[in-house]
Structure formats: C-alpha cells, structure tokens
C-alpha cells in the first residue's frame, strides 16, 4: 500500500471505527492497531501521525491499558482523544484525577483558535464530552488550548514535540466542526497530502484476493448482512467464475426477504 498512513491506536473506545472513518473521509488512509503496539513496529509502519483513542479505563489504575512510552519520542505527531489525551498527559508527567462532576453530552467549549488544531474553527464550539476523569495538571511544556465549564483542560498541546490532546470527541457528529478538527491534525500538523481514495482500497483488496486464491474456487456463506455482502461483491469482481455463494437464512431477515 503506497498511501500515506495514519495509525489509530485502540484503547477500547467505542468510537475507534468512527475515528478511522473520519480520517479516511479526509482522504487519508488509516488503520486501527492495538494500543500497546511497540514503537519499533510503529517506526517500521512509518505513519504520518498517530491517534490514541478513548476508552473506558482510568489511566491511574495499575491494570489500565498503556501505550509504549517511546511513541512520544519518535517525532511522529500524536493526537490523544479522551482517554488518549489523559494517557499521554499521565505518561509524560501530568496529573489525571476523577472529575468532581462527570461530563456527558454536548457541552460548549472555548477554544484557543491560534492552535493549529483549531484553525478556522469558531472560538465557541459545541463538543461531545463523555468522561469521568480529567487532566488536572498538564505535563511540563504543554499548554492548554480549550476549556469547558467543568473541564479546565479540555485540550492541550506541546507544539514543539507535535503532541496534541482533546478531552472531547471530534470524531462524532455531535461535535461541531469535528471532521475539520481531525482534518487540521492531518493537514496542518501531520502534513498529509490526502492521497487516499476508496477505489484504491478496492483495487488493493482485489489484488490481494487474486494472489491468495490463485486458480482455486471459493465457497462463501452469504447471509445478506453487510460483511458477507461486501465480501461477495469484492470476490465477484476479483475472481468471477471461481465463486460459489450459499445463502444462509439465519431467521433474522424481513418477511419473505430471503425468497426475493
């Protein structure tokens, strides 16, 4: 794959697919990898940037998932979202503690628009918050770039090291201008070209399928769900005449849909 790559490191957040998708919607290819992927492996993958996802844990608990601390030394821009921001701040010497008042839902945030992350975004911007912990003290050399009524450090950055964090969720529709915030990270901070198209992905997958299948035949159980339908569509383009689909009626179709 010759496209530039944005790496999404997963810490168990429910929105990881949305993060990957909003990156791709900005024409940058993204892949989701486990949160504890080693810095050496990441250097090998050579991404233009890294996003740390949210997650249900508390960073100060001993069994909470951590990333390799060396990823902050690679010189690759990092954006921590929610748990990702707390994790970055915690690992770099900041202080994370429980909120006096948990924030859930749409909240008005006051943004410092001179931050490259918030370029061309209104100073007052409604964002989606969903957290029970907050960053009480930022690590050394980090500056605060956003606040809400209940969260003094709603975003932060260390521009010299290209480390950025947001406590809110820019990847969801409930955050105004969220896709633009992710776009700013990609284009203003990571220097992305935006060279990814879905057609490229289809071509890549078709090539992979042909290499794997060769002259063999493929038997596919097709339920009519998204996964097996997409798989069938790709296979029929990649290896026409080598594919046999068997319809699996699992009893969850609409009335008579299976017969149609």
Identify the residue ranges that each predicted region occupies.
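Gly/Ala-rich beta-loop-alpha elbow adjacent to hydrolase catalytic centers
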Residues: 80, 84, 89
């Amino acid at each position: 794959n010759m496209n530039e790559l944005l790496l999404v490191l997963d810490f168990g957040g429910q929105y990881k697919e949305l993060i990957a998708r909003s990156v791709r919607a900005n024409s940058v290819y993204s892949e989701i990898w486990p949160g504890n992927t080693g810095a050496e492996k990441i250097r090998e993958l050579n991404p233009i940037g890294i996003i740390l996802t949210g997650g249900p844990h508390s960073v100060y608990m001993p069994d909470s998932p951590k990333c390799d601390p060396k990823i902050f030394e690679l010189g690759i821009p990092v954006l921590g979202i929610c748990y990702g921001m707390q994790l970055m701040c915690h690992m770099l010497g900041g202080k994370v503690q429980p909120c006096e008042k948990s924030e859930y839902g749409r909240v008005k945030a006051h943004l410092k628009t001179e931050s490259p992350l918030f370029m061309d975004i209104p100073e007052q911007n409604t964002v989606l918050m969903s957290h029970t912990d907050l960053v009480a003290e930022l690590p050394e050399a980090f500056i605060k770039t956003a606040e809400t009524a209940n969260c003094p450090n709603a975003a932060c950055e260390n521009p010299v090291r290209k480390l950025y964090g947001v406590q809110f969720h820019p990847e969801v529709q409930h955050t105004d201008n969220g896709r633009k915030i992710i776009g700013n990270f990609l284009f203003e901070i990571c220097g992305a070209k935006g060279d990814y198209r879905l057609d490229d992905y289809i071509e890549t997958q078709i090539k992979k399928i042909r290499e794997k299948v060769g002259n063999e035949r493929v038997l596919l159980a097709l339920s009519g769900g998204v996964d097996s339908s997409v798989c069938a569509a790709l296979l029929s383009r990649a290896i026409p005449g080598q594919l046999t689909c068997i319809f699996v009626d699992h009893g969850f179709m609409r009335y008579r849909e299976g017969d149609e």
